[in-house]
Amino acid sequence: MGHPGQRTILVVEDELFIRMSAVGALQDEGFLVLAAKNSAEALNVLSRHSETNILMTDVRMPGYMDGLALVAQVHIDHPEICSIVVSGNASAQQARNAGAFGFVAKPYLMKTLVQAAHDCAAALGETICMHLRPSVPPTF
């Protein structure tokens, strides 16, 4: 368990190298990070980790649900979670329509991804994000 105010972020990305890179960068910034390789795994992780504050998801993934559908479902089931869509295929408008707070276009610099996580964490603290909830090792 982290210190009070520390944010827990779930990274959903089907490509192992990208997922591991994002997890490492976010951990270096002080986030507690969980990881999933697809939407089904992400929903399972969320059901077991109510401390999750932030969802950061890719859009194109194998399985029955893409990242936009995942964000929409999480917005319904866990409206307190702040979501960020990371994609080279979807638009910021599509992300907002699904209920996401933030959007990061691929390809991205890692500092851009980290800044999006910090922005979401700040929104949680200020209750600006419409989908909010004020240490678990990542699973790959």
Segments predicted by a language model, with ranges:
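Acidic, metal-coordinating helix/loop segments flanking the phosphotransfer/catalytic sites
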Residues: A35-I54
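Acidic catalytic/metal-coordinating carboxylates
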Residues: N38, G63-A69
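Hydrophobic/aromatic residues positioned on beta-strands within the core alpha/beta folds
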Residues: S83-V86
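A Lys-centered signature of the CheY-like receiver
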Residues: K106
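Non-catalytic signal-transmission and effector/linker regions of two-component phosphorelay proteins
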Residues: M1-L10, L16, K111-F140
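Active-site residues of response regulator receiver
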Residues: D58-V59
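Two-component/phosphorelay signaling modules centered on CheY-like receiver
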Residues: L16-L34
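Short, glycine/charged-rich "phosphate-handling" switch motifs in NTP-dependent
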Residues: F101
